Amino acid sequence: MSPSSSDRLGYPFSTFLDQHSAQLNASAVPPELWHSLYRKLSDQTFDAGDHFQIICEMDENDEKKTLFVRALEDMHNNDEENIFLIDHFISFPAESARKCVESNEKLPERLAALFGIDDDDCSSDGDETVEKIETSCEKEEEEHARRLSEPGLPRHESVDARLSSYSVDDPKKTMTERVMRNLWKFAQTYTVSYQLENGEMEKKHVWYVMDDFGSRIRHSGCPNVRIVPLMFLPQNCAYSIMFLTKPVKIDDEITMDWAANVITAKNPEWRQYLEMPWAEKDFSSESMVPGPPTLEYFTSGRNPDFLADEKDKKTCESAIFSALSVLKKQGKIKIFLQIFADDTQLTEHLKSRQIEYVDDWKAADVIWMIKHFHDYSNLAQENPCAQINQFPFESCITVKDLLAACAMRDPSKNDWYQLTYNLNTQLPEFVARFQNRQKNGEHNVWIVKPWNLARGMEMAVTDDLNQIIRMVETGPKIVCEYIARPLLFPRPDNGNKVKFDLRYIVFVNAIGPVTAYVYNRFWIRFAINQFQLGAYDDLETHFTVFNYLDKEKVLQMKCEKFVEIIEKTYPKLKWTQIQADINSTIRKAIEVAASEPSPRGVAPNTQSRAMYGVDIMLQESPESPDVIKPTLLEINFMPDTTRACQYYPDFADTVFDTMFLDEIDPTKVTPI
């Protein structure tokens, strides 16, 4: 090989290997193909059309077409030239799929042709390929703004009415809906890592649809090619690369395993469920009820917490009582409160307390940490008079999948928590439930949530089983029954009646029995668009919290004004009763999460206190729209207190008074 061919445009093969060998090894690309891949990427050689052909066949009645790819020649998987580039037609984050599809007026039609759902698709030349569409943030924002400017729909008072409120009579909307229904049969995903401003690494999952050639390759459990994504670093651009896994003969159909992913590898017995987007089966008669979670469910992948023994707990109880007696005299702090903190977002707002930061937690009165603490046994022995803002095994409250596991074991769960499945352990039962509801014509809309991401990232509201199954590929998730009848709020800024949820700050001073208080003021997060059942991937209709690009869309309102408007909008609703029901719901959730011994539940600990952000949504009872019930959404560890400290200058003092000094002010907090 000549030197020039191994050093293309100043980009040598050795550099290619340095930058890409980790990806190639992880994707199991045979090393003998790497140099050909390097050459084709460097020269932008897309030569699949020289070796393969897209075939369109009609059935006997010329009504249904079948699109697939076949080989034009005999080919061997050991031939180093038999590796091929496939371009990506569109790329998008899961939560913005519709926004991407609607960002270009020609895109739905072209995607329909790509997916084989356009009646005119077969009339085109067989060699014709669909042009790659370039979308821009500006076009997406313009389209999004146009949708927001449309007048809102009137308030509907029944589930059936709301189900019919989203119309797709417009041919363009109909085309878009058909595309969205088929998207998850053709989309693939890869992960990119990038560095945040604070130096931490963040991962982002990108979904993409391959070009005309790649999208025509059908699924098979016994494939003859493998297709994997590759991020080509010189261009900062992703491609798919295809290589043979076995020899093929001329006219053989080319197939890939679309269900090949880490979940299938980990749970091979689930393959028939994970293949549902391409090979639908009926599981509606199978069990819909998962078995109880195992002990490993609560411990796998998590650092263990080490508990203090009973003797040390009693020592701590006496030590804390004595320390508080010294700290307080006639209700006023007489000496400095020693604080060990790894985050000062809240503590820097302390005003009525004389504090001093210490570098050693062994010398602290209060340990205030955003980093998870694990060794409570050592804490009790080294600093028995200290109080810490965490409970052992509190992940049973603050991690979505564990909270769901705790909630699902409560017989009264339907009164305060939505039906929830863990897609990483209970997918077969969920598929059975979904198909059973589908057969019976029941409400069948679900919200998919990752365990550990916030602000709407990788969340989806959908009635599409294929989408739910595919979302398992990008990390652990739960799926919850979607609240179809939320209490709506009339936004004064845009006139829309929108979804909202409520953020409460809750202080837990003891577990077993529970001693807890709720901060008397709460925060409201509003959706933007008029609520309707339909277009579930419209984030600004179905989500209340996400990363806002346009800050003007954010409605800030104090809770007193919110209550005034709610009671005026719903004259039969009395907020005092709603608030009492909310308090009961929060207490119930904490009690359930602590109802079993650790690690299946939160453990009591003498030195522990905690502050949680609790998210609540209000929904109408199916039996009567006049009956409003609170539903717990999630509980968050160390919630952001920026707005709390801005709105209420004494908030930080209230936190410390309530949690650590046993000074309970009923004008600020209420026991629950």
Swiss-Prot record:
GO MF assignments: ATP binding
Provide this UniProt record's keywords sorted from A to Z: ATP-binding, Nucleotide-binding
Q: Where is the signal peptide?
A: none
Segments passing through the bilayer: none
Q: Name one matching Pfam family.
A: TTL
Does Nucleotide-binding appear among the keywords?
yes
Q: In what residue span(s) does the TTL domain sit? A: 332-670
InterPro entries found in the cross-reference section = TTL/TTLL_fam, TTLL12
Gene Ontology CC? cytoplasm
Q: Has the keyword Nucleotide-binding been applied to this entry?
A: yes
A Gene Ontology biological process annotation?
Answer: reproductive behavior
Question: Please, which domain of life does this record's source organism belong to?
Answer: Eukaryota
Alphabetized SUPFAM superfamilies for the sequence: Glutathione synthetase ATP-binding domain-like
**UniProt binding sites for ATP:** C480, E481, Y482, I483, K499, D501
Which PROSITE patterns does the entry mention? TTL
PANTHER family xrefs: TUBULIN--TYROSINE LIGASE-LIKE PROTEIN 12
Reported function: Regulates microtubule dynamics in uterine muscle cells.
Family listed:
Belongs to the tubulin--tyrosine ligase family.
Q: What is this protein called?
A: Tubulin--tyrosine ligase-like protein 12
Q: Which organism is it from?
A: Caenorhabditis briggsae
Gene symbol here is ttll-12
